[in-house]
Amino acid sequence: MRVFSFALSIFAATMFGAVAALAQSPGASAPAFTLTDTAGKSVQLADFRGKYVVLEWTNPECPFVRKHYTSGNMQGLQKEWAAHDVVWLSINSTHAGNLEYKTPAEMAKWMEAQGGAATATLIDGTSATGRAYAARATPHMFVIDPTGTVRYNGAIDDRRTANPADAKVARNYVRAALTEAMAGKPVSVESTSPYGCSIKY
């Protein structure tokens, strides 16, 4: 009986992962969520219907995240696309019970120190939103169009290293997806494998 229960739990976990992965595939509707930002304000994805939205999974403890902030790459993208009325939501899905968890105040302080320019920094302390999107790494990026459809899911760029210098010469998939989608063109690269640190669920 114990073996059966274990096997059933493995099957359920596998099926949940498969359903979550399907839910955030390019062409699918982006899963709805409501999270709290670092100022304590409730933020829903639905608040931004009619706009392009970028989701950035982040964790200050991750060297791959620090690569993009140390180089100024992430802040530069945030500012670049804010000028085009794109909403940028940075999400920390590190579980509240994990040693790497950051309180809202700690996340706000870190983002301010980096010069972050996201529309909002959101705390997903239960990891529910991260799991709904099957987010696997920090950074893991999603581009959602004004209809709520996922247009891109994956790595931020094609330089899979933690070296800040690489960010300046990389092919940036997020910029490419936004540029093409906002011009009414098909997104040429809709999905890639994200690289970085595992999300601490």
Could you say what each language-model-derived stretch is?
Residues 33-53:
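A short beta-strand-turn-helix
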Residues 85-101, 117-127:
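Thiol-based oxidoreductase modules, predominantly thioredoxin-like and allied folds used
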Residues 46-66, 88, 178:
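Short active-site neighborhood of thiol/selenol oxidoreductases, capturing the structured segment around
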Residues 7-18:
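Bacterial N-terminal signal peptides
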Residues 51-52, 67-91:
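Conserved helix-turn-beta segment immediately C-terminal to the redox Cys motif
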